[in-house]
């Protein structure tokens, strides 16, 4: 079993670019069919570590779905981000959905 550093609904920050994001899904290892050079560097060992589906915002505030290696992400300590409140809302919504049990018929 591979342990992941981040969890679904957690806010993270891209280490190189500094963008704020929210983890929406986790793959135990790289799982896209054909990796491009941008997605996986020449070091193939990155494929064996967790990869994260992360929602970030572009410069216009529109959501972008990204697929990032664990090594590219860092912890985000601040919970409230007035400049990107939609990401705060998304993170809170995901966390509430994961905590609240749902009845299924």
From Swiss-Prot:
One of its GO terms (molecular function) is DNA binding. Keywords: Cytoplasm, Stress response. It comes from the Bacteria. SUPFAM superfamilies: YccV-like. InterPro entries: Hemimethylated_DNA-bd_dom, Hemimethylated_DNA-bd_sf, HspQ. Pfam families: YccV-like. GO terms for biological process: response to heat. GO terms for cellular component: cytoplasm. It is found in: Cytoplasm. SMART domains: YccV-like (SM00992). Involved in the degradation of certain denaturated proteins, including DnaA, during heat shock stress. Belongs to the HspQ family. This is Heat shock protein HspQ. It comes from Blochmanniella floridana. The lineage of its organism: Bacteria, Pseudomonadati, Pseudomonadota, Gammaproteobacteria, Enterobacterales. The gene is hspQ.
């Amino acid at each position: 079993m591979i342990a992941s550093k981040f969890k679904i609904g957690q806010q993270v920050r891209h280490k190189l670019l500094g963008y704020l994001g929210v983890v929406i899904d986790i793959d135990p290892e790289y799982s896209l069919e054909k990796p491009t050079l941008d997605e996986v560097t020449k070091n193939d060992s990155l494929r064996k570590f967790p990869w994260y589906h992360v929602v970030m915002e572009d410069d216009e505030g529109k959501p972008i779905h990204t697929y990032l290696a664990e090594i590219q992400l860092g912890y985000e300590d601040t919970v409230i981000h007035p400049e990107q409140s939609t990401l705060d809302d998304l993170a809170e919504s995901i966390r509430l959905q994961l905590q609240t049990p749902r009845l299924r018929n």
